[in-house]
Structures are given as structure tokens and as C-alpha cells.
Amino acid sequence: MQKEPTKKAAGKRNAGANPPRKLSRAEKKQIAEVIRQARGDGKAHTAQQTIPYLTMYPDGICKVSEKKYSKSIAFEDINYQLAQADDKTAIFENWCDFLNYFDASVSVQLSFINQGTQREQAEKAINIPAQDDAFNSIRTEYSDMLKNQLSKGNNGLVKHKYITFSIEADNPAAAKARLSRIETDVLNNFKVLGAAARPMTGYERLNVLHGVFHPEGEPFRFDFSWLAPSGLSTKDFIAPSSFQFGEGRYFRMGRKIGAVSFLEILAPELNDRMLADILDLETGVIINLHIRSIDQTEAIKTIKRKITDLDKMKIEEQKKAVRSGYDMDIIPSDLATFGNEAKNLLQDLQSRNERMFLLTFLVVNMADTKRKLENDIFAAAGIAQKYNCALTRLDYQQEAGLMSSIPLGENLIPIQRGLTTSSTAIFIPFITQELFQTGAALYYGLNALSNNMILCDRKQLKNPNGLILGTPGSGKSFAAKREMTNAFLITDDDIIICDPEAEYFSLVQRLNGQVIRLSPTGKGIDGKPQYVNPMDINLNYSEDDSPLALKSDFILSLCELVIGGKEGLQPIDKTVIDRAVRNVYRPFLANPDPANMPILGDLYDELLKQPEPEAARIASALELYVSGSLNVFNHRTNVELSNRLVCFDIKQLGKQLKKLGLLIVQDQVWNRVTVNRAEKKSTRYYMDEFHLLLKEEQTAAYSVEIWKRFRKWGGIPTAITQNVKDLLSSREVENIFENSDFVLMLNQAAGDRAILAKQLNISPQQMKYVTHTEAGEGLIFYGNVVLPFVDRFPKDTELYRVMTTKPEEVSEA
């Protein structure tokens, strides 16, 4: 208002000057063009202008428009499809509560982005580089097997899930305060659902946008510190080389052609599998659900008005019927149906904790060629048709559709469908978890639901202890061999095997490991003497200052096993043994030379020197193992125990010696673990036929101790057994189950299935995967993740021949 006088004053000052000349038509046109360009015509002229946001802040808040701000959270999948019926219902109800949390002032966008550009990264994760040793042929073979398995699944498709919520605010500070509160509540809701979730930074959100706009997989290079010196905006770092939207039914983005469609929800009842089935497509598909809550009071008023309108129409129809001489109860069926549905809807909103939502369901397909794109769209449309819905192309709205399909919280498509809470929640964003870790992750087969590879690292678990359970012939030993081979090839871990059935010789020999055959004759596989000294000790044997205390405890267990009897060792017996142990180790502790290492005979001699009659009794019991026919353990160790791969073959030990042999092997493993701990090295210990260790009180107690303490010392024990009942034989032994975060469960007998279902809370749907299944099929439990798996190892390989335990295949090999 104040600028007008100024303009007039300027006019008076110019009155005495030459009158301005008139502009030519061409000049007027040129100036109008400059003004039009300066003002803008509302259309995007660059790829950057197409992307509908103003500013992305480093903390993850995005200023979408002048008064609209959004934030995103990335969340992980949970096992919904295989959950127990009660768990499924609980997940669904919690998801309904989650949606009801958002009021009309918050817009929500669920984004599911399947990016098919990560094949190189997946191959990098499974690549086993060659080394300067004798195992490169095996590395190549194992690596080829992994690549072949990768090609069967869609691990090249990385599936991401995001929730974006947006609000109106006057300034960034006000937006930040409210978005922060919503973020906290959303994270708590995901915690209730059992889904891992994390807020996204500005960099992470830009990285997601870059991934959508560069489906070929170009790396994202950006840092917020680059913006000020360069004068560029964040859009310059994420925009593709070009957008083309002129074709009406398609868009082009860089070298890709794509199309955006929306889902017409026509079905009277919706199914929770539809979203899952579309996401299961092995194509680069992007699905977005824009959800906006309607104010509850407003929704109820609207429905009441509708009911009133329908009642008016009903009265008019009845009047018409009376005038025409018809029965007034005969009214159009649609009118009656709509009236009943409206009343049911009103009842839901008023008394059943339901709210009304407006939903826009968008599907983006992208491909290299138009033919491939049409095939992908046809596949997605077929799934929609299966559930009585329709996938309809957004003709001449491709730009708005694509920009509504990036996780910014902006919906530019006005096609919305009104749904109640439970109808909206049926598009549940959970299917099945995936397990594809990188680094030192080992291969365990393919996910039976998604066909994706299962790669995981037990060291990442809070408790890496493991169990491999299955009936004879289900593939237990093979699974253990595959894991230890994989660990041998890609880690520096030491591997020790307790082998009661002589099943591991071929594999250990091929990997240049050491097989120690413990037998009554003391002869190894090559006929030469092989001895292991049960009195071996190293100065790291215990985590406190006295390694002797723990070693004394082991020798007490050994003597208890030797003496036997229901009552075992009496207190005075234990005192005598402990004294003798301390005396016999004194020379070695004073001068820790291997030549000073005591043997059982030294303990026997020391016991005879003690004055108590109990000492003579214990010495007499030991005599059989010192100078008698079972004296195989009365020698200093003469075998190489420092090999990376050591297998203790105890098949030839008789009944009397086997119990002792099992205990001595466990002690040797403990020795090795303590040495490796000092070197910061992990030790994997495999116990086949684990039920044998649980039959004797001493070995069972030692096993429980291993399960409790190995983790702190870098040990990773794995028990392999077919006898699940033995694992539950006592409360103490049951701790082994509770202290195992890794379970590989193969086919199970009926009785064991019932026990395991109760112990591990396995649903009937999950139990199908361990019921009458083929070898190499089952369930993998990794922490809180439970997945069905299938492992088909190629038989035409050298590794298969040295790993198989099938008699006919062993003889062929």
C-alpha cells in the first residue's frame, strides 16, 4: 500500500524528460517471457525441481513444503506368516493399536522398497578369496556352491521397510519437538510388536531417495559439509540424470522405464497375504501406502449423515412403491445393503475401537525394457486379481505417482479409499525375517519361504552356544561338517571335534587336520602310538590366579568316574586327592617345562605316600589305568594338539574307557580354549552323539560348565544329538537348552516334536518344517529369529564326498 505514492512521485520527476517510447510487440513478448521465467510457471524444468521437498536436515527431518515436515523410521521384518495363531492375532491387534495412535493431524506413509541392485554386494559377502595354502580348490568349490545358491534366491533384492510420518508446523523448531515425540511413540510401538526399528538420519533418508532414483546401483556420495562450499542443494546429489513423463502410462528415469499403478480395493473382504505376495515378486517393486486418519467425531457425523440420506431415499422408494401399488417393503437391494453396511460401520466406530482412514495404495514397477516392465506389472496385477482387487495404471499422473512413492510423506495422488482400522491393518507389513549377515557369516541353507540365502555369524549372538538336533539320517553330521568347513575357510578359528563314531576322518584329513584316535592299544590310525595326558595343564587354565584349583576339580571328576558307585567320592577322599594333586604339580609350576608335566602314575605314587587309608583305596582304583590293561592315559601327550583342526576319534575306546575318554577330551578342549583366549582366538568345539556325555554325571556336569563358561573364553560349543529327551533329563542339563541361542533343528520324531514345541514355543506352522522332512531341511533358531531352511549341497563335489556319512556314498567315495 505504501509503494503506490512512490511510483507516482517517480512519474512527476520524469515529466519534464522525453516521453518513454512504446515497446514493439517483439520486445513485449521478450519481457513477458523473462517475467514468466522469473515467476515460474508451476512446472518442473529440471530433475531437481521434480523432487517434492524443500530441505533435508542432517537430523533426518525433511521440510516437504512451507508448513509440512516429515521424519522416517526404518524397521525390520518379524515372523508373522509362520507365527502361532495366538501370536498372529496379537501382532494384528498390536498393529491396529499402532495405526489408531495416529490422529488426523499426522499423515503416515509405509514404504516397501525392493531394490534389485545389490547382487554385487551379495556376491562380495559370500566370496572366499584364495590364499597361499593347499585349500584353494575347496575354497573355489565352496564359493561356486554359494554363488549357485545365491542365484536360486533373490538376495540381489534388498528389501527395506520404512514408515514416514508428517505434520504441519509453523517452523522447524516446532516441527522438531512434535516429530521427536511421535518418533519415540512409534519406536515404542515397534518394540511392542517385536520389530527392530531405528530413526533415520538425513544422510540415510537421502541415500534411500538416491537408491530409488538410481536403480542401476550407482554409489551414493554425499556429505552435508559439501553443501555450503559448493552452493549445491541435497537434491543435486540424489537426482537422476533425467526424468521423462511425456508418455502418459510410463515414466523414464535415467536408463530405466517404469510405471506407477494404484490398487483399487474392490473385495468385500481383504486378505493379509496380498501385500506379502506382491512383495515376494522377484522384481524391483516399490509399494507405498499413504494412510491418513479422519477425525473420529467428523467420521461419525459423516456416517450419520449418510445413514440419514439413505433413510430418506428408502422413504422415497417406499412412497413410490405405495403409489404404484407395490409392497412397501420391496426396495432396491443396493439401498438395503448400503444402509446395513453404514449402520455396521457406525457401530464399529462407536463401540469397537475402530477409526476411519483414507488409504492410497501405490505400486511402482521399473525395468530395463518395456516388455519386461509389462510382464512385471502383469504379475503384480495377477496377484491383485487373485484377491478380488485391481491394479490400475495412473494415466497422465505418472510424475505425481512416482513422487508419492518416495518416503517423504507427501501424497500427490487424490485417489483414496476409506477403510476402518482393521481393514487398513490387514495390509500388515510383516512377512518373514531374513538372515543375511556379512563379515564372518557362515552359510546355513536357503530360507524355505523366500528362497533367500541364510548367512549368519554365531559370534554376534549374546550366547553363541549351539545345538544340532535331528533323527538319524536327517543330516545332523553333514550340517556340522558344512559349518566347520565354512568356518575353516573364512575364519581363523580353531576347530575341535569329539567323534564317537569315526565319521569325521575324511574331512579332517582333507583339511590337513590332526585325527587323534584314542584306543585301548594307544595306536593311532597310522599304527604309531598316540597318547593324550589327562594331567596336561597350562598356566591360563583358570581365569583366576590359581589354574590348579580348576584342574583339581577335573581330576576329582576323573577319580569319581574311576571309583564309581552310587555315593561317589566322600569328603575325605576329595581332601586326599586335592592334596596329592597340589603336591604332584609343584615341580611343574616351579619350572613349567613339558618334561616336568605329571602323568597319572605320578598321582598314583603321590596317593600311596599319603597316610590316610582312603588314599590307598583311591590309588587301588587308579591302578587299572596306571599299570593295568587300561593304561592308555598314563603317558605324556605325544600328538600335535596345536593344529587348527583336531578330531578326537574315540570309537575304539571300550565301555570302561569311553567315559574316561569323553571327560579327558573335554579337559583337553578346555586347555585349548584357555590358550586361544590369551591369543584372542575363537575355538569351535563339536560334540557328536552328545547324549553319551549326558549319561554320566561327571561328563554331564562338565558339559553344563562348558555351556556356562565357554562364551567368556571365546569358545563356541555345538552339541549334535538325536536324543532330545536326554537334554531335558535334569534341571541342570536343561540349562544347556536355555544357554543355546543357536539351534539347527532337522527332522524330528513325534515324541521329540512335542517336547521341542513346548520348550522353544514352536508354532504348528513352523513344526511342519521338521515333520517327515527330507535330509537337510528344518528350522534354524538364531537368537530371536526362527526360519525354515533347505540345504541341498551339490553331490558332484569333492566336499560332498568327504562330508557325507551315507554308507553307500562313503563306499563310493
How would you describe each model-predicted region?
Residues 468:
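Hydrophobic anchor at the beta1->P-loop junction of P-loop NTPases
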Residues 517-522, 742-751:
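Conserved AAA+ ATPase "SRH/arginine-finger" region at the nucleotide-binding site
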Residues 486-496, 511:
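Post-Walker A helix-loop "phosphate-sensing" segment adjacent to the P-loop in P-loop NTPases
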Residues 760-813:
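Conserved P-loop NTPase
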Residues 78, 85-104, 115, 277-279, ...:
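P-loop NTPase motor domains
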Residues 476:
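Conserved lysine of the Walker
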Residues 479:
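Hydrophobic positions on the alpha1 helix immediately C-terminal to the Walker A/P-loop
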Residues 1-430:
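Extended, folded cores of ATP/NTP-driven motor/assembly subunits in large transport
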